[in-house]
Amino acid sequence: MEDSDTSAILAEDSESVDSRTVCRCFRVTENKAPPPCSCPLSVTVEPVMFLSTFSIVLQAPLCTQYLWDRLSEDVGYNGTKTGGCNASTVHDPLQTEVETLTAHWSLYINLGGFLVGLFMVILLGSWSDRAGRRLVLIIPSLGLAVQAAVYLTVMYLKLPVFWFLIGRICSGLSGDFNAILAGCFAYVADTSERGSRTFRVAILEACLGLAGMFASIIGGQWRRAQGYINPFWLVLATNLTAALYAYLFVPETVTPDPQARLFSTRHHQAVCRLYSSDAPPGRRSKLWLYILCFFLVVTVHLGCSDLYVLYELSAPLCWGPELIGYGSAAKHLAYLTSLTGLRAMQCCLEDSWVALVGLTSNMVGLVVISVADTTALMFTGYGLCFLFMASTPVLRSKLSKLVDPAEQGALFASVACVEGLCSLVSSGVFNALYPATLHFMKGFPFVFGAAILLIPAGIIGGLGCQEKRESRENREGFGIS
């Protein structure tokens, strides 16, 4: 093939991509009413992500600790309050009973939220392709505010912990936090170029870590000083603020269609077409494999996160609220270190190998945490996980690049659905595995999680080699050295 022909082909491809990008830009910027207010800073959905994550991370360990305290009162256990939590009480039957009850109630609450929110996430995410992204940010924020209000009612009136499940279901009816994730990542896909998408996604995920770090530090100290109620008032206010910000400041990227209906089978059909179409050839298999990797990585992350507080509360660590807050802050600090590491590694490594480094960091950290019997060793495990979030931005970006611009909403709706499934599976597996393995190895679930991560590592490595080989063959076919 002549060099002139090669140049013409590449120019034509570039022109078609540019024209498609231009069309996309016009589609998302014209004929839409601007928000009531304009933000002077060059940010869009980042504050929504930050505020929603702040509320979730602030309430999650407090809910677990509240369940622990309420269930301890029910069975008459007061080991952590009287200083009885030490190495000699590892086999205390009351402590084991409280751990088991707390793990099971966490399972029931997460299961209830998942079953209700599963289909709502798909509906809301795909619906946003026609109705607009802002609604998918506002509705779940209001649902999370209702959940916080129910939790406050339980604490004020000392209602049975069953009412926590009711609050979780209320949040699930609005799409829960996963709908906010879907809306935010679809928004970034609308407004970013292919070359910069991985880093833009990583910035959005860094908002998760920054908010989580602040919430963890504040939550532990605040709960120790004033109990549970005041922090949950902040959770309520934060969710309302997120909804208000999305309404006032976030520009719309999709022209709203007045005919768009939320409850329609077309949303599920769009997702089915996305995963059944094999044009271009090979796309479908890559899409399924990357979704499988994403499912396994997020399942391990959520499953282990659910157990950290239980693991730290009981012997031999016996952490109080302050140390639990610092531990959660250290875990969320890894979001920021992962962002920095990802940016640095992109200078010399392809995205697939960046993801492998992140998975390796995660596996090593989990193994150390599984044998942690001192505070120093536990924080060492957290420190070794400093790149553990480098893999998920790569996976989201690769999935986004496999589909057309008009399919981004359906894609991230399905990804959000997978995240909901991850929440269910992680709760079912890890919260059941933890009490079942207490008698022979307390940290076994973390070793199990590290072993599971070997699967996505192998898949990502294999696909990375295949993509590199295909890229080399394409260059040779065009006569490009």
UniProtKB/Swiss-Prot annotation:
Glycans are attached at N78, N86. It is a multi-pass membrane protein. The chain crosses the membrane at residues 46-64, 103-128, 133-155, 161-174, 198-223, 229-247, 287-309, 323-345, 352-371, 376-396, 409-434, 443-461. One of its GO terms (cellular component) is endosome membrane. One of its GO terms (molecular function) is methotrexate transmembrane transporter activity. H(+) binds at D176, E205, H301. The keyword Cytoplasm applies. Belongs to the major facilitator superfamily. SLC46A family. PANTHER family: PROTON-COUPLED FOLATE TRANSPORTER, ZGC:174356. This is Proton-coupled folate transporter.
